[in-house]
Amino acid sequence: MKIAGILQELLGNTFMSIAEEMGAVLVKSAYSTNIKERKDCSCALFDAAGNTIAQAEHIPMHLGSMLGLIGEIKRHFKLEEIKPGDMFIANDPYNGGGTHLPDIAVASPVFYDGEIVAFVANIAHHNDVGGRVPGSNAADSDSIYAEGIRIPTVKIFREGELDKDILNLILLNCRVRHIRLGDLNAQFACNKKGVQRMEDVCAKYGQETVAPGM
């Protein structure tokens, strides 16, 4: 189905505004100066196939990392295993994570009428994820195992319920636990806002209009 150029432009700007709003939620909710002041973070929207729809004006290099996470989700989880309210987390550069271990990525599916219509994702640089030195940036490390905890692509939320065991496992391996928790909660809130906004767009225009607009 083709849509009119004006509607295409309207939807494109709507998607960009959603990504920017996600970024505002993340920056304003975060605990660490790395995210609040340096804005070492990014937010993006993807269609159901994992193609990029929009990325907020943060750090373009992060886009590849978020694309990797969406790809890992689609590779390692069957369609019927992904539910509304699920949220995925990863930081391992070799398994769908960021550009390095301190970059933690979080992605959520967007459902409408029982089907996945999009994904929202964000990535943020955490001050510390363990490893042999504070800050988790030992440039002379000869192994990734010295850099910090490796998080494969796993569900951190299952149908809207936080998996506290996985969260505690991550926090136990990080210095300054309360700041890590605050930043992770900001990332979770960011995605929830993105999912809500995308659902609103689908409800307003209908999925038969929104899908071609992506």
Residue ranges and their predicted role:
Residues 2-10, 150-214:
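N-terminal leader/propeptide and maturation segments of large enzyme subunits in energy/redox metabolism
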Residues 14-38, 74-78, 92-98:
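Short, basic/aromatic recognition patches
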Residues 116-173:
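Gly/Pro-rich active-site capping loops and adjacent beta-alpha segments
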Residues 43-47:
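Short hydrophobic alpha-helical segments used for membrane anchoring or interfacial signaling
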Residues 48-55, 67-92:
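Regulatory sensory and allosteric helical modules in signal-transduction proteins
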Residues 37-41, 102-105:
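Short, small/polar residue-rich loop motifs at catalytic or cofactor-binding pockets
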Residues 103-113, 121:
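A short, hydrophobic, proline-anchored segment that marks a local hinge/packing element in signaling
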Residues 60-73, 127-136:
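A short, polar/charged loop-to-alpha-helix boundary motif
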